[in-house]
């Protein structure tokens, strides 16, 4: 269970404890595109031990909250080339601290925040509705670099 996972890693409700948690998720999970979808819950992803950045972030946020810290889901862009990315942040001693369990690293100035919320549902890249027969295909590719 998620509680047992926290206990097994001896996680404390501190920035250092959350770094340990982020590393633990990175080591526990397999990155597997297509193994989950936008409706997959943190508990489901945790049980499968696989997912994508969205799932890693959901699990991190859920476990941080379970450890007793306010936490939020973040959608944005990491430095380099690719698509959107997700990570988690905790509120500690008046500051937000970011952790990227997908890449096993702290969030730094190379990350650009697009949206924050309780989970993916609060910050999708796009949102809308169709009326009548419709279909949609979206491809996102970005490049972030220092200038």
Regions found by a protein language model. Give the residues of each.
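Secondary-structure boundary elements
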Residues: 1-51, 59, 120, 131-147
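Hydrophobic/aromatic-rich core segments of domains that either
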Residues: 23, 55-134
């Amino acid at each position: 269970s998620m509680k047992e996972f926290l206990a097994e890693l001896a996680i404390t409700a501190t920035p250092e404890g959350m770094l340990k948690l982020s590393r633990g998720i990175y080591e526990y999970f397999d990155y597997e595109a297509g193994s989950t979808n936008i409706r997959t819950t943190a508990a489901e992803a945790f049980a499968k031990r696989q997912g994508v950045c969205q799932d890693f972030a959901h699990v991190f946020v859920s476990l941080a909250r379970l450890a007793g810290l306010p936490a939020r889901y973040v959608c944005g862009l990491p430095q380099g080339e690719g698509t959107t990315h997700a990570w988690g942040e905790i509120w500690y001693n008046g500051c937000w601290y970011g952790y990227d369990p997908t890449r096993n690293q702290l969030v730094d100035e190379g990350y650009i925040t697009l949206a924050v919320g309780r989970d993916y549902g609060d910050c999708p890249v796009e949102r809308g509705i169709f009326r009548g027969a419709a279909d949609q295909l979206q491809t996102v590719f970005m490049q972030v670099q220092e200038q």
